[in-house]
């Protein structure tokens, strides 16, 4: 498994689900959304990857921490809560080619202001075990 396979797997999970496609309209991005992107949208970010080794320091697998941030420009979190719930439902305990397991860890909320405009996010954090 290469590092990019986890990226591709995660992106595929979020873009091939019918409910998420309807809610996000395909607006799932790696690291940053393009300027002028419509909301709501999801941004995937690799926070860190740590090698898990045996006693002989042979690589057994990698433990990758990923954040999925669902952003809105609406005045409340209400419209993105079902999206966050669906992402958690899809990813928690999921596996696939090169992905041994995915575990939901935590979430947080965040708000940013840019001029008069407010943006809100629900950020989900997952541990993805890859090999």
What is each residue range found by the language model?
Residues 1, 74, 78, 113-116:
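Charge-dense, low-complexity intrinsically disordered segments
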Residues 16, 89-131:
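Acidic-leaning, charged glycine-interspersed low-complexity segments
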């Amino acid at each position: 498994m290469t590092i990019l396979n986890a990226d591709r797997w995660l992106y595929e999970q979020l873009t091939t689900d019918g409910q998420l496609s309807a809610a996000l309209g395909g607006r799932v991005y790696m690291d940053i959304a393009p300027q002028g992107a419509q909301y709501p949208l999801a941004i995937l970010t690799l926070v860190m990857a740590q090698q898990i080794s045996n006693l002989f320091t042979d690589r057994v697998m990698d433990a990758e921490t990923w954040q999925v941030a669902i952003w809105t420009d609406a005045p409340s979190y209400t419209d993105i809560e079902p999206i966050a719930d669906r992402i958690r439902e899809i990813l928690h305990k999921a596996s696939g080619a090169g992905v041994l397991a995915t575990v939901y860890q935590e979430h947080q909320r965040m708000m940013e202001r840019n001029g008069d405009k407010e943006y809100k996010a629900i950020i989900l954090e997952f541990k993805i075990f890859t090999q």
